[in-house]
Amino acid sequence: MDVNKLMAELERKHPGESEYLQAVREVLMTVEEAYNQHPEFEANRIAERIVEPDRSFTFKVVWVDDKGEVQVNTGYRVQFNNAIGPYKGGLRFHPSVNPSILKFLGFEQIFKNALTTLPMGGAKGGSDFNPKGKSDREVMRFCQAFMTELWRHIGPETDCLLYTSDAADEED
């Protein structure tokens, strides 16, 4: 594996996704020597297969706030490598959420899940929705709208959501 060549290709495909590209570079540089001792890895293009998401999608989340006003947020889900089982990963609701951050977190989730020895791939999802300052009813309506859209793309044999505290970090 030539890390620089692989990274150049990823940078071409994913311009401006600095968090994701940095995470991939760090992992590849860490495993490069061991990887190159196994020609079968290169023959099967394992590195290329693991660094690219299997699927990534964006969807609109429409919900109504307490004033009766329609709000529109963006929802995301990134799914990485389901070779050993369904995708598994959490949700993050924060204004800073973007495709690069979710690709970075989904890529890392592959390895976290592998370390548990459970047959699960990696995933991460979320939205640019900010729960801070929202009423419990607004958070509930947003979550209902989010899941109404997300459910079309996931299921028990495809993608299992994981609870994380990211969605509940209202108080700082």
Language-model segments: residues:
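N-terminal cap/recognition module
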Residues: 69-110
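Flexible, glycine/charged-enriched surface loops at secondary-structure junctions
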Residues: 20-21, 37-44, 117, 154-162
